[in-house]
Swiss-Prot record:
The keyword Disulfide bond applies. Keywords: Calvin cycle, Carbon dioxide fixation, Chloroplast, Disulfide bond, Lyase, Magnesium, Metal-binding, Monooxygenase, Oxidoreductase, Photorespiration, Photosynthesis, Plastid. The lineage of its organism: Eukaryota, Viridiplantae, Streptophyta, Embryophyta, Tracheophyta. The record marks K300 as: Transition state stabilizer. This is Ribulose bisphosphate carboxylase large chain. The disulfide bond which can form in the large chain dimeric partners within the hexadecamer appears to be associated with oxidative stress and protein turnover. The active site is at K141, H260. It is an enzyme of class 4 (lyase). Its EC number is 4.1.1.39. Gene3D superfamilies: Ribulose bisphosphate carboxylase, large subunit, C-terminal domain, RuBisCO large subunit, N-terminal domain.
Amino acid sequence: DILAAFRVTPQPGVPPEEAGAAVAAESSTGTWTTVWTDGLTSLDRYKGRCYHIEPVPGDPDQYICYVAYPLDLFEEGSXTNMFTSIVGNVFGFKALRVLRLEDLRIPVAYTKTFQGPPHGIQVERDKLNKYGRPLMGCTIKPKLGLSAKNYGRAVYECLRGGLDFTKDDENVNSQPFMRWRDRFLFCAEAIYKAQAETGEIKGHYLNATAGTCEEMMKRAIFARELGVPIVMHDYLTGGFTANTTLAHYCRDNGLLLHIHRAMHAVIDRQKNHGMHFRVLAKALRMSGGDHIHAGTVVGKLEGERDITLGFVDLLRDDYIEKDRSRGIYFTQDWVSLPGVIPVASGGIHVWHMPALTEIFGDDSVLQFGGGTLGHPWGNAPGAVANRVALEACVKARNEGRDLAAEGNVIIREACKWSPELSAACEVWKEIKFEFEAMDTLDK
């Protein structure tokens, strides 16, 4: 069975058992009345069952309801159908005040019907020939308004300075100021020029997201013909069907696939209603993607540390034990489905480097947009500053130093032999994003 954990807040007067049963029925075989065609099938075989209810500590009106869904309710290899069944209709149910899907347990039999990520973590490292450290990226800013040639120039400067990747912003598709084909050509030129100068393999996440699947595939095919290593997709706005289609193409044609989660906070930010990002992360691993944005813990975007580390493990590891202290409701066995690299992006800069290196480890992408392009000396020095800071943190960690305790000291030591890093440290020494997370663990 597929197991689901729902956070249920019933309407006043509705007992939790009735609310849990309603969720199970409405998201499987049930309807609002008895119908004569019920007698033509075996409802006992197909209906969802609410098998356990537990109160939420500190909130007498909320319950965690566990529902089991028989596997025959779902089409094989279709994240689209899985979500249509489990969350498609039930969230508008009048007997519930609010409802949130906290986690899913995907059984091995269903997991094996998915291709998963096009390549996975180890294959990506082998393609890029980069080992022993996090990868580094940069979102090109301003996100909208640059011409294709100026955009390509910014890409070149960042890659030349020492970054591994640069990135289209999620809303860069094919607008009047910069059509997709022009952007692809200038970015490819920038990649090849930077590779020739540095001797390192470089990439730019070329956003293939489009208004139709056919147009999306046309862009991905053009990227492959240019010989670039990676393309990008906005998987929530583009949809799971489009994403799985693109992931299959990427595996067949040797392209890495970077996934942006634009629109996720509409679904996952409120603690009481919607769907937790760990569910969206699991679905992405099944649908397919080699990278996905996963918050930063320390930057400008929402993300509590324990929760973030919980779904980072769900993205990367083969087997994850149930651990409610990190928000993981079920043990999950991925049976060798390739892992996804989490991307830390959003309001981060060189002073965050020790914390990011400690939190995310080597199998991650640390992405500095403003933290690269905002450098007072320009894009390339901004890239140099980030690369030097990362190398210093990795070296210190490998020597056994405590990044959490000595992080600032490590960065200041590196400043002595990198004027670019010293300038960056001066610019961002006062920048902090200290707000309490909306989505927190139950205490």
